[in-house]
Structures are given as structure tokens and as C-alpha cells.
């Protein structure tokens, strides 16, 4: 950006202002302060889910994962994309538990079972109870959720936030 601005003889201070005030969009590595940090990310296709899992795995601390999977109109009713995402990436020693929640929690749990994660899976269909469970675990946590789960989950996280 700076190179282009410089080549066009534009004022570089404008870029500085933008960089200093830029904030990520909702559900893009958004952090909430529960008993421990909780990061939420939107997933809506295999590529997005794979990138989020790569980011999660870049953090070496012990952690919990929660996946909220819905199939409302805005999400798209076809959730077959979960079979194309590389959920085997969650088969890590430092991932202690994976909570499956949302309207299609059991579909997500089945998908994870096929990756050999059955000992780490806990299904909590109710989103409020799932977030409360994460908070009580007192461990860094990462939430991956589909579009319609994102707004509801963010609202729950705001209420739980310290």
C-alpha cells in the first residue's frame, strides 16, 4: 500500500491514520475476556475453516475448541462442506476438548468422530450453555461458528465477559 501511495505521490500520513484506526470485522479473530481469553472466528466453507484451524494450531497453549454449526437460510442448508474441511488438524495434544453446539451439533460431532477425536467431543446443543461451559473450564478457548451462530454467540460472550 505504501509503495503504491509513494509512487502516486500521495500523502503517506493518510495510510498511517488508516493503519492505526483499522479494526477487524466481527468474528475475525475477535477476542473476548472470559475467565481466560476466548477468540471467535466465522467459518462458512472448507477454506475458511482450514485457515481458522491453522491459526488455532499456531498457539501452543492448552485450549478448548467450540464449534457452533447451524444450517439456517443465511448459513446455507447444505453443511456437506464440513466433510471437505481438514478437521484432523484438531487432533492435537494441546486441544483438550471440542464442544459441538448449534442446530447441527451432532453432525459436527460425527464429522469429528471420523477424525478419531471421539474422546475429546462434548455435545452441548444450547449455545448459552456451551459458552458457559467454556468459561467455567478456565482455559484459553477458540470458537468457530457459522454465520447465524456468530451474532448470537457474540452477544452471549459479551454478557459472560469480565
Language model features: what each stretch is:
Residues 21, 26-28, 48-51, 127-131:
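A short, well-structured juxtamembrane/interface segment
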Residues 106-162:
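Generic C-terminus detector
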Residues 8-11, 58-62, 134-141:
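Glycine-rich phosphate-binding loop signature in dinucleotide/nucleotide-binding domains
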Residues 1-8, 49-52:
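Buried hydrophobic packing segments
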